[in-house]
């Protein structure tokens, strides 16, 4: 009775599993089961059928499968009676030597007679042989069985996914059945053939050669190229690296880290070329947008069977500012005019600039802070003091973003003196505070305490200034504790070593840590007199924004920051007198 039920089953074209007739849907170009229709959706079934048809055609091996017997018929009661004693067990391996002339029978030996001829494809795994042989009892005509041979062609690639040594051992363990392999098959044969491997290796070699040439041009600042090309490449290279992702699948993220210009033969015009690492940290480098877009398009599998209809720029998005969640279409940054160097890239579309690590350090794992999460988080205002231990390990958002891009051992890593680590910054500031206010090492910090509003602190605070510091989340009362407050913003102020800190408005030199720092723009620093005059000019009503006159947005949002009432009262208080360096 089980054989009768098996003969009524039909095979789904997509999942390739036996289904009862009532579970099949015949409304499409191929018979599919209701499970596949419900899982994939009726609107996508035809696309998947086309993709499956192309895959099965492209994976059919040259040897193919012999059509075998001319026809199959349903088992009769006489056949069932003759095979009743054999239906519960598989025949021994020697049964393969029987001739395959029993076309009208569905008995057990028929499962193995397909492997007797050298022109037929034999599967090394007994489980796969059983799966293939059991399909002969589905009652299909030989015309449909030919299509079934192509339909099941994907099974031939399954053993190739195993290590070659394991596959060779499995084949040798079959004894006499190992001789039934087709002449063109080899246990150690690669999945896509030697031609595919050679083509892949050649592509990688060409891409690395182009990348080497691009890095050499970057080191020489593209000497000998036209001025427009040179300036464009320098501007774009200053913005690298930055993230790119696939528009239809945001989980596919790569990283653009280099640019170059290639000459086009017709008019000897130059065309922009960018180099992308995808996925991030994999070390796989793609030259050009089309190559990485094709790979992302293939990995997304949203619309299999289709090809890219454009150059790939409309399928990719780039991150305008790292960690902000602001993604724009790559075609807005690299327009046709920009790619042909006829016009400069729009300044408002350029990605946020970060230190550019070497390509070797680009793919390394990001460094870890001792006990802090390095993911950029939006700043939030705090009205209560924090313990000094937590303050010492705090990093600003700018510092987090910089450390995200720099890998250990790179030219901008935390171990090098170019960009000091938070511990080194703390030591430098402590030494500066201990020697002289004019020491260049003391000019690299600000008093931003992690909140969204400006703050000010001093190394030797009077009691009136203790309230100001506590209001902004830092409860230091000694020069050492004050250095901890400065270390949190050492990398976020953007000040270069040796450059004096000056007020953005009056250009007067600022005391080491006595100034108002804009939390959004590192270059916005204001002295207390200018901040006081700005607050008074705004009047008592309304919000008081950045003293520069701009409404600087908070990191990760479009909402501008504003002074808190406690901060306004502290800045306007008359008992705070900031001592300038020029004062005696």
Curated annotation (Swiss-Prot):
One annotated Gene Ontology cellular component of this protein: nucleus
Keyword Transcription: yes
Chain positions with Phosphoserine modification: 66, 125, 186, 371, 384, 421, 436, 453, 457
Domain of life: Eukaryota
Region (Disordered): 59-120, 346-421, 433-495
Coiled-coil zones: 197-217
Residues modified as Omega-N-methylarginine: 177
Catalytic activity: S-ubiquitinyl-[E2 ubiquitin-conjugating enzyme]-L-cysteine + [acceptor protein]-L-lysine = [E2 ubiquitin-conjugating enzyme]-L-cysteine + N(6)-ubiquitinyl-[acceptor protein]-L-lysine
General function of this protein: Acts as a transcriptional corepressor in a IRF2-dependent manner; this repression is not mediated by histone deacetylase activities. May act as an E3 ligase towards JDP2, enhancing its polyubiquitination. Represses ATF2-dependent transcriptional activation.
Family recorded in the similarity comment: Belongs to the IRF2BP family.
Protein name: Interferon regulatory factor 2-binding protein 1
Source organism of the structure: Mus musculus
Taxonomy of the source species: Eukaryota, Metazoa, Chordata, Craniata, Vertebrata
């Amino acid at each position: 009775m089980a054989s009768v039920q098996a003969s009524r089953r039909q095979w789904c074209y997509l999942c390739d599993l036996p289904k009862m007739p009532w579970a099949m849907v015949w409304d499409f170009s191929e018979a599919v089961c209701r499970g596949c229709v419900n899982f994939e959706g009726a609107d996508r079934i035809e696309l998947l059928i086309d993709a499956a048809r192309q895959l099965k055609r492209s994976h059919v091996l040259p040897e193919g499968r012999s059509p075998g017997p001319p026809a199959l018929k349903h088992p009769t009661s006489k056949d069932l009676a003759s095979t009743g004693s054999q239906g519960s067990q598989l025949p021994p391996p020697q049964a393969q030597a029987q001739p395959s002339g029993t076309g009208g029978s569905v008995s057990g030996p028929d499962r193995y007679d397909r492997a007797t001829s050298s022109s037929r494809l034999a599967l090394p795994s007994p489980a796969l042989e059983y799966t293939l042989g059991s399909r002969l009892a589905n009652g299909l005509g030989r015309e449909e069985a030919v299509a079934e041979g192509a339909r099941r062609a994907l099974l031939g690639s399954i053993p190739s996914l195993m290590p070659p040594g394991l596959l060779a051992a499995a084949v040798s363990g079959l004894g006499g059945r190992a001789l039934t392999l087709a002449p063109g098959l080899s246990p150690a044969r690669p999945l896509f053939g030697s031609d595919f491997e050679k083509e892949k290796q050649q592509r990688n070699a060409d891409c690395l050669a182009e990348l080497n040439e691009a890095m050499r041009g970057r080191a020489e600042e593209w000497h000998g190229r036209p001025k427009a090309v040179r300036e464009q490449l320098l501007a774009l290279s200053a913005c690298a690296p930055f993230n790119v992702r696939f528009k239809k699948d945001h989980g596919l993220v790569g990283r653009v880290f280099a640019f170059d210009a290639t000459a086009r033969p017709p008019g000897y015009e130059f065309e922009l070329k960018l180099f992308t690492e995808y996925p991030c940290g994999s070390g796989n480098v793609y030259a050009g947008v089309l190559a990485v877009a094709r790979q992302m398009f293939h990995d997304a599998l949203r619309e299999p069977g289709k090809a890219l209809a454009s150059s790939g720029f409309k399928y990719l998005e780039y991150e305008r500012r790292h960690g902000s969640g602001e993604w724009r279409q790559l075609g807005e940054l690299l327009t046709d005019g920009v790619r042909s160097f006829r016009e400069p890239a729009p300044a408002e579309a350029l990605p946020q600039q970060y230190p550019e690590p070497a390509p070797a350090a680009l793919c390394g794992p990001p460094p870890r802070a001792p006990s802090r999460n390095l993911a950029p988080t939006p700043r939030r205002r705090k009205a209560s003091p924090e313990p000094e231990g937590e303050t010492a390990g705090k990093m600003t958002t700018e510092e987090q973003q910089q450390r995200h891009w720099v890998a250990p051992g790179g030219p901008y890593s935390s171990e090098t003196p170019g960009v000091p680590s938070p511990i080194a910054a703390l030591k430098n500031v402590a030494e500066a505070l201990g020697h002289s206010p004019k020491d260049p090492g003391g000019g690299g910090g600000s008093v931003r305490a992690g909140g969204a509003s400006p703050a000010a602190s001093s190394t030797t605070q009077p009691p009136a200034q203790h309230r100001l510091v506590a209001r902004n989340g830092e409860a230091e009362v000694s020069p050492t504790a004050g250095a901890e407050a400065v270390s949190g913003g050492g990398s976020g102020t953007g000040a270069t070593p040796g450059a004096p800190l000056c007020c953005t408005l009056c250009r007067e030199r600022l005391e080491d840590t006595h100034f108002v720092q804009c939390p959004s723009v590192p270059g916005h620093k204001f002295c207390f007199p200018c901040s006081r005059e700005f607050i008074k000019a705004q009047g008592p009503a309304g919000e008081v924004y950045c003293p520069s006159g701009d409404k600087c947005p908070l990191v990760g949002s479009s909402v501008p920051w504003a002074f808190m009432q406690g901060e306004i009262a502290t800045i306007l208080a008359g008992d705070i007198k900031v001592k300038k360096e020029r004062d005696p």
